Regions:
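Short beta-alpha junction loops
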Residues: 9-11, 67-72, 182-183
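Short aromatic-enriched loop/helix-cap "lid" or pocket-rim segments at secondary-structure transitions
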Residues: 18-19, 47, 75-80, 189-192, ...
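Internal, well-ordered interaction modules that form the hydrophobic cores of assembly/scaffold domains
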Residues: 29-56, 64-66
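Short acidic, S/G/P-rich loop/turn micro-motifs used as interaction or catalytic elements
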Residues: 39-43, 71, 148-151, 156
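Short catalytic/ligand-binding loop motif for oxyanion handling, primarily in non-cytosolic enzymes
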Residues: 42-44, 71-76, 185-188
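Conserved catalytic core of nucleotide-sugar-dependent glycosyltransferases
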Residues: 50-150
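C-terminal catalytic/acceptor-binding lobe
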Residues: 113-278
Length: 281
């Protein structure tokens, strides 16, 4: 059985405040864990073989991550390495105004990847290992050894992204590493969602997956699990995903409010939003 639903240990409904509890269920000492956001929409063929091989070969890193498309820190890395040439600079901040907050950039980035997928050229983005430390990043896809969480019982703060990506490895005097020789595509941050939902990007990924008969059974099983989860948490399903509750990120909520009221459109930049292949692609 490839997929099992495991209840959140504190009985919390889906939402940001519930995520941290799962780490207490992911600390078996002889196990490697790979965690995905629920809106990872594409994995490069042989993804698991590549990521797990790197994870096994590099036990000193606390977290190992693939190259994540639509992740601000990964976008900065692609820009720095000359793989992409965006119209504006993307900074190393995981909440970068462009790499995290600009929906039109996310659409351009997805279209860039989709073009490479169709041409069978995603390996052109591969750039080896890149170590990162003391820098928070969006943990859209991460891998760890259960034995590394076991000493502290897998207890992670509600602000689990900062804990897992920066605070815990700092306390352990460990670094993290992006293994960019395999790729995962992350659909959207909530700052981008309203725009990307109307872009047809999700349907393009679905079309690509539909053309892979070897995963048809897994897609059907995933659909059954999604329907079971929606039946269990109908209020979340009605929201179209995880609802935003008592977030402390006031800046994020302001952006969300502007999206919902149609005011977050980057009108002054719209004609200048573009993403070109970089010189090193």
């Amino acid at each position: 059985q490839r997929v099992r639903l495991i209840a959140q240990p504190d009985g919390k409904a889906p939402g940001v405040p519930a995520i941290h509890g799962f780490h207490r269920l992911a600390m078996d000492v002889d196990t490697i864990y790979i965690r995905f956001d629920d809106d990872i929409v594409w994995l490069e063929p042989c993804f698991f073989e590549a990521l797990l091989r790197f994870r096994v070969d590099h036990p000193d890193y606390f977290l190992v991550m693939p190259l994540v498309i639509n992740n601000a820190v990964c976008s900065n890395l692609l820009q720095t390495l000359g793989k992409i040439a965006p119209w504006r600079h993307i900074h190393t901040n995981c909440f970068d105004r462009i790499g995290w907050g600009q929906p039109e950039f996310a659409v351009a980035l997805h279209r860039f990847l989709l073009d490479l997928i169709r041409r069978g050229e995603t390996a052109r983005l591969h750039s080896g290992a890149h170590v990162v430390a003391l820098n928070r990043f969006s943990i859209n896809c991460i891998s760890w050894f259960g034995r590394d969480l076991a000493p502290f019982g897998g207890e992670v703060r509600v602000e689990e992204e900062e804990d897992m990506s920066a605070a815990i490895p700092a306390r352990l005097r460990r670094t993290n590493c992006f293994c960019t020789d395999t790729i995962a595509a992350h659909f959207a941050f909530f700052t981008q969602r309203a725009w990307i939902d109307r872009s047809g990007i999700l349907e393009q990924y679905a079309g690509i997956l539909a053309g892979r008969p070897e995963i048809a059974g897994l897609l059907a099983e995933a659909g059954e699990i999604r329907r079971a989860a929606e039946a269990r948490y109908p209020s979340v399903a009605a929201e179209g995903g995880v609802p935003i509750r008592r977030s402390r990120w006031r800046m994020q909520l302001r952006i969300l409010g502007r999206i919902l009221t149609g005011k977050y459109s980057f009108k002054k930049e719209r004609k200048r939003v573009f993403l070109n292949p970089g010189p090193a692609l």
